[in-house]
Amino acid sequence: MTLEKFVSELQDESQPLKHAGLLQLSSLAGEDLYEFKNAWYSLPEPRKGQIMSKLVELNEDHAEMDFTAMYRALLNDENDDVREQAAKGLWECDDRVVIRPLIGLLKKDPSARVRAAAATSLAKFTDLFQQGKILSRDGDKIRDALLEVIGEEEE
């Protein structure tokens, strides 16, 4: 099944999410990622949450699947559930490019669930920092953001 056909099937909420179709979303890049992002905004809101939950679940069960580009692209989605799942999906990512957006979610997202998911995904980087595997400035940014959030009364 082509990506275009699969995206069209995603529109139909009466259809179950197909495992094989979702696997096509692994390692999306370039034009395919661009097309998927454009189609994403026309999907029904409940369907978006279903898709993201399923992708995170697939990622946990199949380590070889890489939905990082999808997660990164959807960190700023309007839907709290989508942002939460996108942040959760990055828990295994060790690419420093996700540090800044995760810190942004941690510090400014209106949803406590999204902020918690961002903090959880940043935890991997704190481990890498302690092991000397990421830049000091990145580790310092993460530490400062976490300490700032911990110091806030409502958190």
Which functions belong to the PLM regions below?
Residues 89, 123, 152-155:
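Charged/polar, low-hydrophobicity segments characteristic of intrinsically disordered regions
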